[in-house]
From Swiss-Prot:
Subcellular location per the Swiss-Prot or TrEMBL entry: Cytoplasm
Major enzyme class: transferase
GO MF, any single term: guanine phosphoribosyltransferase activity
Complex and partners: Homodimer.
Biological pathway: Purine metabolism; IMP biosynthesis via salvage pathway; IMP from hypoxanthine: step 1/1
Stated role: Catalyzes a salvage reaction resulting in the formation of IMP that is energically less costly than de novo synthesis.
InterPro entries with a match to the protein in the record: HGPRTase-like (IPR026597), PRibTrfase_dom (IPR000836), PRTase-like (IPR029057), Pur/Pyrimidine_PRTase (IPR050118)
Coiled coil location: none
Record-stated family: Belongs to the purine/pyrimidine phosphoribosyltransferase family. Archaeal HPRT subfamily.
Protein name as catalogued: Hypoxanthine/guanine phosphoribosyltransferase
NCBIfam families, alphabetized: HPT_Archaea, PRK02304.1-4
Amino acid sequence: MKLLKESLKNAPVIMKGNYPYFIHPLTDGIPEIDPAVLKDAVNEIIKVIDIDNFDKIVAVEAMGLPIGVALSMELTKPMTVIRKRPYGLSGEVMVEQQTGYSKGKLYINSISSQDTLLLVDDVLSTGGTITAVVDGIKKIGAKISDIVVVVNKNRNIKEVEQKIGFKIKTIVNIEIVDGKVKVLD
């Protein structure tokens, strides 16, 4: 996890209105994603999940995708993507998402009530994305085995967990202090 932590410490921070936003390859694709850092993150995720407890990986567009794809390839488990645009397929579920800097809609396809899911995402900030996705998965009736985010910058993670009814496993916890990323663990 050394590579992941070091790369986070060096991540630039910009302001989106009043919201401090860190820029990192695994959360933004900028600069380019170092395969060693991605592998580091995937190895850490594998340590905190039970790989026999789910049959499908779910990743949220956009930056949950590199993590989800790498996990899918490593574990040889199928992956589905929660998209930001509709396809109009039978069974598609739309949820409304609100983050610290935007609002939008997410569209869930290729999940059924028979699925047991591993939900992965790049970062937890406000909890808006995870909350919306979990609500949609609950509507479908699928089971959630684990929820894992690579980077947690939410100081109130327990409130998000209480709201969604699941523990959120995190790989690295950070905070933004004086315009810089501080790794907490």
